């Protein structure tokens, strides 16, 4: 057996999240279905660096699986993409060490969130941006965002139903900037709690709207209560980005991006 690592992109619009769920279309379900076909009916388990929610997209989700097949690693994207639906694409594949783990080998993870700030809605971006019609004080949001840097207990920024006990995480970088009529949020850290990024964005948007002050962030963190933070921003504006792996790096396979014609 050998372990294969993949970098996967997907449009989360028509998925009930990444993780397999009964009677639901999921990214993991599609990947495992195709791998089962390739392995002549043998079930293959796929493990991901993160489990995205309904409607959330990914540009570089890292996954791994074990296989007894011996064909060249650069054939995996071709084999998988030939059977995957158009809203999933394997960008890269690599042979990785046996101790490589898509989740636990991730040193840092990065997410981006897109907010459309124009007065007019855009039907072509409705699945990829959260439309906010009211004015936003970006400087106030930036002052608030820097208070999230460092290691904190992020209980206030975690969904109440989350079962994880240790809610201490480290945020290495948080930034927001304008690109045309969009406001882009970028957050990088060593790991994220359930709905953490979306709650952070929702809270910053309330600060930008003047419903909260930038100085409230410290109090929200100290409260360690979900009720202290703002609303959870919708999933469709969120994109799971790159993961920095500690052992086993996915490199380009010197092949043409197999997904260029699919989007």
From Swiss-Prot:
Matching CDD domains: PseudoU_synth_EcTruA
GO molecular function: RNA binding; tRNA pseudouridine(38-40) synthase activity
Classification via Gene3D superfamilies: Pseudouridine synthase I, catalytic domain, C-terminal subdomain, Pseudouridine synthase I, catalytic domain, N-terminal subdomain
Listed name of the protein: tRNA pseudouridine synthase A
Keywords tagged on the record: Isomerase, tRNA processing
GO annotation (BP), single: tRNA pseudouridine synthesis
Cysteine pairings via disulfide bonds: none
EC number: 5.4.99.12
Record's catalysed reaction(s): uridine(38/39/40) in tRNA = pseudouridine(38/39/40) in tRNA
Function: Formation of pseudouridine at positions 38, 39 and 40 in the anticodon stem and loop of transfer RNAs.
Oligomer status and interactors: Homodimer.
Enzyme class of the recorded protein, top EC level: isomerase
Pfam families to which the protein is assigned, alphabetical: PseudoU_synth_1
Species of provenance: Halalkalibacterium halodurans (strain ATCC BAA-125 / DSM 18197 / FERM 7344 / JCM 9153 / C-125)
Entry keyword Isomerase: yes
Taxonomic classification: Bacteria, Bacillati, Bacillota, Bacilli, Bacillales
UniProt-annotated binding residues for substrate: 111
Region span, Disordered: 232-263
Family stated for the protein in its record: Belongs to the tRNA pseudouridine synthase TruA family.
Compositionally skewed regions (Polar residues) per UniProt: 241-263
């Amino acid at each position: 057996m050998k372990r294969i690592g993949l970098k996967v992109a997907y449009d989360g619009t028509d998925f009930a999240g990444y993780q397999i769920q009964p009677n639901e279309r999921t990214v993991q379900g599609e990947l495992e279905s195709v791998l089962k076909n390739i392995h002549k009916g043998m079930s293959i388990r796929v493990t991901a660096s993160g489990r995205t929610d309904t409607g959330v997209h990914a540009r570089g989700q890292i996954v791994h699986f074990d296989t007894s097949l011996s064909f060249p690693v650069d054939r995996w994207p071709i084999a998988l993409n030939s059977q995957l639906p158009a809203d999933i694409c394997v960008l890269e594949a690599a042979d990785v060490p046996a101790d490589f783990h898509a989740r636990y080998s991730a040193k840092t993870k990065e997410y981006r969130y897109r907010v459309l700030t124009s007065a007019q809605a855009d039907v072509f971006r409705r699945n990829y941006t959260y439309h906010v019609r009211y004015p936003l004080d970006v400087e106030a949001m930036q002052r608030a965002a820097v208070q999230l840097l460092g290691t904190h207990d992020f209980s206030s920024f975690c969904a109440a139903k989350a079962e994880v006990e240790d809610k201490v995480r480290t945020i290495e970088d948080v930034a927001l900037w304008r690109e045309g009529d969009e406001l882009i949020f970028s957050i990088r850290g060593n790991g994220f709690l359930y709905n953490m990024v979306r709650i952070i964005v929702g809270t910053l948007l309330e600060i930008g709207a003047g419903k909260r002050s930038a100085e409230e962030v410290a109090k929200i963190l100290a409260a360690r209560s979900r009720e202290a933070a703002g609303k959870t921003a919708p999933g469709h504006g969120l994109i799971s980005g790159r993961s920095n792996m500690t052992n086993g790096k996915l490199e380009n396979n010197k092949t043409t991006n197999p997904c260029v014609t699919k989007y």
